[in-house]
Structure formats: structure tokens, C-alpha cells
């Protein structure tokens, strides 16, 4: 009876251990080109937090990765994923990021893909609302944090040791990392230079890493592509001035219910709160935030990796921000500061901070849309073809 009971358990353990021991490089061939293409607009967290789909994408010169946060999901006819699908310029946008994906999350992701970033053109959209006084918090960090990428950082010898130490110290401030016993102890030992402890923890950490790696590989080969996306032909073969006119018309049609040029369905939900929000943000600013330190780490990683990024700095909805009392200085100081950081590294930047009051540039209070996407499309097109950007 005991043999019957323990036999399947022992067999399952042997099979599990065998699966973990198989080198992942043997299995990456199961990630098809079709699977990578499907994931380009799926906005699936399994891809953001993994390694393999992004690895395959970064190796392919026909993909242009676009990193950002919640604005990437605002898919409309002017969105880069639609525009460059119907206007073939030789590349396919690949979207990486979701709400709460801020500088530290992207730093971790870039560190995990340093060997694929050299000479790679990428686009990175920076959002002002990341730079609040407290910076990234647990609510936004935890759902986007990747234990696999966190462990990859610990074993990463390509990253500058000082940047690596800064990243580990910063990440140890979050409960999502603190509650991961193996990773948090490994980080602490590395930060404090406790070599004996690092060596003692490494075997368990490597088994843990291998388990997460196989899980990522499974997701990379089997997950569905998500809901079918509608492709609009309305932007095909149009000049930039024609696209601007079309975006104006679309924005006007979809935001006619309010004076803030906010998308009608969004404003419908916001409307009951509008009177209470008047003047509520007096004294606030985006000029002081720990996010600047996280952003600097990310810039350093991209610089060390030899990546070729174009940053897109988007504005806020000026009319709405004025209504809520958010001081203009608290916004302009941010624009100046973040653009200075980017340019100091020698990176290209499409600075759209001058469009706060441009109707239909923003789709709501903080997310780009309609005309804003047209400007972004133009900047991407110019950057991809010339390596430089003059759009603003």
C-alpha cells in the first residue's frame, strides 16, 4: 500500500526535477514568430514580467518596442499600433507596459535584456503622474513587479555594480520584495557585501529562478493573444496635416459633452465629482519625487547597454489641471527637469509639453489620444528613419 501511495509522488517529483533541469535554451524554439507577433499588442502582464517573448522580439530588427504605462492601452485609429500597421514603414510597434509600470519596473526589465539592447532603437513614453511626491508606491509596484526579473538582476554581471546595488536597495523598500524570502535575503547579502551568505543562498535562488523561467517559457508558448483588435484604415496614406485634421474631428466628436476635451464616457463617470475637484490640487507639484532617482537609474542602464532610445514626454490636460488648482509651475518645473535628465545622457526626446492646452491632444486628464498620437506617430516615423527627432 505504501509503495502505491509514494510511487506516484516520487515519479511526479522526478518529472518535476527533470523539467526544471532541462536547459531553457533547448525549448525556446517553441516560441514561434506568430506567437511573438500576437503578443505585440496583447498587453499581457506575463510578457511584461517575463524574459522570453521580449528576448525574441528584441532579436528581430522588424520590431520597434514602445515602453510606457497605461496610455499604451488607449488603442484608437491614431495609436502607433494601428497607424504603422496600415502604413507600412518597415517595422511593427511592440507594446511593453501597463498602468503602474514606472521607471523602477522598466529599469528591472531593461537590466534583464541588456544584451539585446545594444544598437536597438526603442521608444519610451514618460508620464508626468509618475513624479508625484511619494513616487512609485506598493499599489502600483506590486502588480507589475517580476520575481523572475528580480532574480535575474541578482545574477546579472553586465550591469554596473553601483547601479545594481542602488536598484536592490530601492527595491527592498517594497513589500513585494521584502515578502520574497529568498530574493530579499539575497539582495541584503549582496548590498552588505556578505559573500558567504550570497554563496549560501545561491543554490536555492537558482532553483527558484529556474522554476520561474520554465513558467515564463510555458506562458510564452501557450497563452492566447487576447481579444481581437479592430484595425482602422481611416489613417492610411494620409499626410500629417490631413491626420491632424482627422484627429481634430474625431476628438471633437468624442468629447463634445464637456469643455475639458475629455472623452465622453470618461467624463460621464467623472462629472458627479467635478464640482468637488475644483481647486483641490493647490500647492501640488511634480518637481520633487523619488521617481527622478528611479528614472536616472533607468537612463544609466540604457546608456550602459548601448540602446538608442527616443523619449516622448507627454503633457497633462492643461484646462483640467488649471481647474483643479494644480500650479503651472509644478508642471513646467517637471517638464524642464525630466527633459534635462534625458538630454544629459545624449538621448533623443520628443518634447510635447507645449501642448497642454491643445484641444484633443489628450484623451482625458492624463492620457494622450487623438491628435497627441498623431504627433507621436510623426516623431516615431522620423526617429526610425533618421535616428533623430525634431518634432515637438
From Swiss-Prot:
GO terms for cellular component: plasma membrane. Pathway: Cell wall biogenesis; lipoteichoic acid biosynthesis. The chain crosses the membrane at residues 5-25. The keyword Cytoplasm does not apply. Its main location: membrane. GO terms for biological process: lipoteichoic acid biosynthetic process. Residues 1-4 are cytoplasmic. InterPro entries: DltD, LTA_DltD. It is found in: Cell membrane. SUPFAM superfamilies: SGNH hydrolase. It is a single-pass type II membrane protein. Residues 26-392 are extracellular. Pfam families: DltD (PF04914). The keyword Membrane applies. Keywords: Cell membrane, Membrane, Signal-anchor, Transmembrane, Transmembrane helix. Involved in the D-alanylation of lipoteichoic acid (LTA). Could be responsible for the transfer of DltC-carried D-alanyl groups to cell membrane phosphatidylglycerol (PG), or alternatively of D-alanine residues from D-Ala-undecaprenol phosphate to the poly(glycerophosphate) chains of LTA. D-alanylation of LTA plays an important role in modulating the properties of the cell wall in Gram-positive bacteria, influencing the net charge of the cell wall. Belongs to the DltD family. This is Protein DltD. It comes from Bacillus subtilis (strain 168). The gene is dltD.
